């Protein structure tokens, strides 16, 4: 990134509509590398650092020269990008061609380019002389989207901007695909990746490191937001390697059915959904069903003496005593004394969703816009509520998040508990979350960071002095109390195989984290910085941000104010051109946010420049139709 741009800002105000200095510095780098040099870039910015706005600002710059195609994982994130495109346009302060920008979900893009599951090669010529931006690039490989991107790269010879907060998902294979997509050479994966018998033994070898450094030199942008504007994280439980884990000791009932499931149903235990299920809760015969939908249709079927299922509804005293779930026993007991909002991650959406719903209802927590809990717990005279986010409710996710993130819900009085499966990706932001729970141990370091990154990010907290509490729950045997202090103690399979499933997953997670961190440090070292005058294509964008910062603190100045002129000439060296720019923003009534007047426009009054507050007003039920194309970004589901 261009550190010369960062040096132009002093005490940047982040609390107003703004482009952050590192975003402008990165934008400069992207314009030079992708547009000027026609080279692909991996934007490896850690979650919460504003990759989306950087990508959209770049798309606006690039739209003057080429067509820009933006691919996002799903329809919900498509909506987020469309909303953020409006934000980016308002901050851009320069010309762009909106008709040249196309935003698609991966499924929508697939339907445009495949006929009967076969790539329409004749149609790919439309992507000549274009730029592709791919959000969450680490997730596109191993499916048709990844295949299509590779074909477009080879056929059209175009550059890619790949966005990722975690370019390694499970193994270095993902990074290998990214290298292949970004470089002009074909990668032989067998040469760069060493494979053992286990996933954790998949490593980027020395040849791979050299290939990485050679092919991606000058193509990596790494950035991690300083944590000075973030709350501290307080991990709960006992020390486990470099973190803390809550040991949830199973009851005899849970341990018995847990062991039956482990022996009878788990041929590849680490990746078997049955172990995810029984580590969360056991449900008797439900554990042994391969088709849960069949059992959901049973009427008054007994799972345990105190637990039955009827047409997919669980009921019975066991939902309160919770011998079926050591994790929920800890969770329910703990939340009674906690204040604030909770975000709870789980991975087994069908089974887990059933368990969560009826345990919560039975223990006095009401479903948001649904059933009321038994003897409901209250907050501010209203029931404490929960919601469960799974892939089955995509259409209502945005509305739910609007409620969860609203200022009125900072205390959780509207919606306190948000349970989410894997549908929630890093593109979503959760605000004012004070408690983060892991009901399922994540598969990868990337996934773990994404879950934390949904909540713990810049601008998500009004008060950063209060910590965020993290609870990593592990279901363990009733007599299990091992101290896990070093990975070196668990290098032999026979030692690992006797461990509880969740503990094994944690160890595998840490083994893979070791390799991930090694590669991330290489990528970080490859990220280049330089100090140059801003690229001509972003001068007006940069000046717009400098002006916003200046007039935040200045409500009224002399027209020939020396500080304003000095600021503008730091970018436009010619004083006459600088004065012309000042004339343009005043006569054009540039929009600013002022600390006294809030939303304001710049005006000339006698020999002064003043900030004039404004408010939009309208008559009820009056519609205005603008026949000019106000918003031309094309999107498809």
Swiss-Prot record:
What's in the GO CC field?
Answer: virion component
Under Enzyme Commission nomenclature, its number is 3.6.4.-
Instruction: Write out the residues that bind ATP.
Output: 45-52
Q: Transcription regulation as a keyword?
A: yes
- State the superkingdom: Viruses
Which enzyme class?
Answer: hydrolase
Ranges annotated as spanning the membrane: none
The question of whether DNA-binding is a record keyword is answered with yes
The segment(s) forming the Helicase C-terminal domain are 327-507
The record places domain Helicase ATP-binding at 32-185
Which keywords are on file for this protein? Activator, ATP-binding, DNA-binding, Helicase, Hydrolase, Late protein, Nucleotide-binding, Transcription, Transcription regulation, Virion
Give the matching InterPro entries: DNA/RNA_helicase_DEAH_CS, Helicase/UvrB_N, Helicase_ATP-bd, Helicase_C-like, P-loop_NTPase
Q: Which Pfam families match?
A: Helicase_C, ResIII
Query: What is a GO molecular function of this protein?
Result: helicase activity
Q: Where found in the cell?
A: Virion
Q: Where is this motif: DEXH box?
A: 135-138
Q: Primary place of residence?
A: virion
Q: Spell out the CDD domains in the cross-references.
A: SF2_C (cd18785)
- What role does it play? Acts with RNA polymerase to initiate transcription from early gene promoters. Is recruited by the RPO-associated protein of 94 kDa RAP94/OPG109 to form the early transcription complex, which also contains the core RNA polymerase. ETF heterodimer binds to early gene promoters.
- Quaternary structure? Heterodimer of a 70 kDa and a 82 kDa subunit. Part of the early transcription complex composed of ETF, RAP94/OPG109, and the DNA-directed RNA polymerase.
What family is this protein classified in? Belongs to the helicase family. VETF subfamily.
The name of this protein is Early transcription factor 70 kDa subunit
Which organism is this protein's natural source? Vaccinia virus (strain Tian Tan) (VACV)
Task: Write the gene name.
Answer: OPG118
